[in-house]
């Protein structure tokens, strides 16, 4: 089999369309066949007997750095798998122009010089899809596998919507090499590339964000809990869509909003808010234990699917951890932090002893999690910076050996960002100061940004990194500290009020403009401009914070869910 991606020649032209808003609906005709139409076309609408899902798309990339998408499933009577397929198809039609551009900027060229790797990867993914299909068929009443079925059908629908092939036959061999599928498994790819020994391609690095910064901050007098995440990634990934999905599965988290990308039904960052009033984020942790890669098999559920299931089904941090831990794939190994805002009483002295914050870490064959509420109220913050916290994970991942080899940069409590968070977390008093900290980078002046390098500092050693500012001719003890296509590309923040409507404040693009050593990112002057595809992106990234108001409020849903749950429990 030849697992080669096809370049989409028309993508650039399609991406230049001037239309800013699109609404697409998937429905069923009276005879049961699927149909879709663009809102406003009455002739098409009259063919429908039952609406299934509608996607509302609003493109503000050039104005705010973000596009916005809401997908609403119409009825709880629609089977899970059809909810997923209809939602995915509507999104694929509404966002296809950005999908085209994102594919060019990220996936194209991934298999160049790596045919053997992509052959093995494709066979692995086909086996994985077949295994999940078998489990779904053998367990039709199992709620977990119903959720898996919803998720994979959402992916199939997304691909079919993008290709305008409503109801087309599913071919796993074609799906497994489709660029949209590759975008879906972007996080999992980092570990799969290690397992199948992908050769390094300096011209194309496509994987998950790899590194991020995160902070959960308890304000004085329990005034609020601020919840923030900064994605670090290739600058080629900066076409962004903030999304809100509203399913009708009856689950506590059936409605959720998240920061995301074209062609991705997951966050990938990850930053997610659910109608169960859970706020969820992750920061990736490295796995340096090559022997553990043997535990990665096709008979598991990849992280991108397990996370979606946990988001929808959990009403607490513990439930999230338990759902996420099933069928651990050992890929996209992260530290996940779940804050349950239902348990937090803003401004009250007396707070629950447990249940507010839960921390989960994964490695192949290992899921470690525990409640960290007491820690949060004692220390007033929980940071995330790509180093594992739990000793079992540190040992199993061989992170302790990396500390021995390279020093404190790989340690949990002495790595630069750990020290910066420890020093600066008390500067956070409100949303604005949280954004300021999470966008901070003063690498030429901050003593905590220093390294055994020439020049003696690195723009990587900051809460919001800008590795493009490191000199090309600099010398560094390891590549992560040097010049590369890698930096902070956003910030997202929510609090106990915003989460009621699944809102968050977000800034798109790299940090810049505060000091002369960290200029505003501009493709016209960037040394990466000829090396990194960035079709459809604004040239100059100098956007203000945005708090987008969704069309529908999720707060009412959760109270209705709680009422129904109590009624059913009393029967």
From Swiss-Prot:
GO terms for molecular function: phospholipase activity. GO terms for biological process: phospholipid catabolic process. InterPro entries: PLipase_B-like. Glycans are attached at residues 62, 149, 442, 473. The keyword Transmembrane helix does not apply. It is found in: Lysosome. Its EC number is 3.1.1.-. Its main location: other. It holds the Pfam family Phospholip_B. Keywords: Glycoprotein, Hydrolase, Lipid degradation, Lipid metabolism, Lysosome, Signal. Residues 1-18 form the signal peptide. One of its GO terms (cellular component) is lysosome. It is an enzyme of class 3 (hydrolase). Belongs to the phospholipase B-like family. Putative phospholipase. PANTHER family: PHOSPHOLIPASE B-LIKE 2-RELATED, PHOSPHOLIPASE B-RELATED. This is Putative phospholipase B-like 1.
């Amino acid at each position: 089999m030849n697992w080669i991606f096809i370049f989409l020649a028309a993508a650039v032209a399609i991406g230049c369309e001037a239309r800013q808003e699109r609404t697409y609906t998937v429905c069923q005709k009276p005879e049961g066949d699927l149909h879709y139409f663009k809102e406003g076309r009455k002739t098409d609408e009259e063919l429908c007997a039952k609406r299934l899902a509608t996607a509302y798309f609003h493109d503000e990339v050039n104005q705010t750095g973000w596009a916005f998408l809401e997908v609403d499933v119409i009825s709880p009577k629609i089977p899970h798998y059809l909810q997923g397929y209809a939602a995915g198809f509507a999104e694929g039609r509404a966002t296809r122009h950005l999908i085209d551009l994102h594919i060019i900027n990220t996936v194209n060229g991934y298999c160049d010089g790596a045919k053997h790797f992509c052959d093995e990867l494709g066979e692995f993914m086909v086996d994985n899809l077949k295994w999940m299909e078998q489990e779904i068929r053998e367990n039709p009443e199992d709620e977990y596998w119903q959720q898996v079925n919803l998720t994979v059908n959402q992916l199939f629908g997304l691909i079919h919507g993008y290709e305008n092939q409503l109801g087309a036959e599913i071919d796993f061999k074609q799906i497994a090499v489709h660029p949209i599928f590759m975008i879906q498994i972007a996080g999992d790819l980092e570990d799969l590339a290690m397992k199948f020994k992908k050769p390094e391609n300096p011209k194309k690095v496509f994987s998950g964000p790899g590194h991020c910064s995160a902070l959960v901050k308890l304000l004085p007098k329990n005034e609020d809990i601020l919840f923030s995440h900064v994605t670090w990634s290739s600058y080629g990934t900066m076409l962004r869509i903030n999304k809100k999905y509203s399913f009708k599965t009856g689950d506590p988290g059936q409605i959720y909003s998240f920061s995301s990308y074209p062609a991705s039904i997951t966050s990938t960052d990850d930053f997610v808010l659910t109608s169960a009033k859970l706020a969820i984020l992750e920061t990736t942790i490295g796995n340096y234990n090559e022997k553990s890669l043997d535990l990665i098999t096709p008979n598991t559920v990849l992280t991108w699917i397990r996370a979606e299931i946990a988001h929808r089904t959990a009403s607490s941090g513990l439930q999230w951890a338990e759902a996420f831990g099933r069928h651990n794939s050992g890929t996209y190994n992260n530290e996940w932090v779940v804050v349950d805002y239902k348990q937090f009483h803003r401004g009250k002295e007396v707070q629950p002893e447990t249940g507010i914050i839960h921390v989960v870490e994964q490695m192949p064959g290992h899921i470690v999690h525990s409640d960290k509420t007491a820690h949060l109220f004692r220390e007033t913050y929980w940071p995330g910076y790509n180093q594992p916290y739990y000793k079992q994970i540190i040992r199993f991942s061989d992170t302790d050996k990396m500390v021995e080899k390279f020093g404190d940069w790989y340690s949990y409590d002495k790595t630069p960002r750990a020290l910066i968070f420890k020093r600066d977390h008390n500067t956070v008093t409100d949303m604005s100061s949280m954004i300021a900290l999470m966008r901070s980078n003063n690498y030429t002046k901050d003593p905590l940004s220093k390294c055994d390098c020439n020049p003696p500092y690195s723009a990587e050693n900051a809460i919001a990194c800008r590795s493009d500012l490191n000199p090309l001719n600099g010398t560094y003890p390891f590549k992560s500290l040097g010049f590369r296509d890698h930096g902070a590309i956003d910030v997202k923040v929510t609090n106990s009020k915003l989460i009621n409507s699944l809102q968050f404040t977000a800034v798109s693009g790299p940090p810049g403009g505060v000091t002369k050593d960290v200029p505003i990112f501009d493709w016209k002057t960037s040394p990466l401009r000829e090396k990194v595809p960035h079709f459809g992106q604004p040239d100059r990234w100098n956007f203000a914070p945005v708090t987008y108001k969704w069309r529908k409020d999720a707060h009412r849903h959760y109270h209705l869910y709680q009422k129904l749950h109590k009624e059913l429990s009393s029967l």
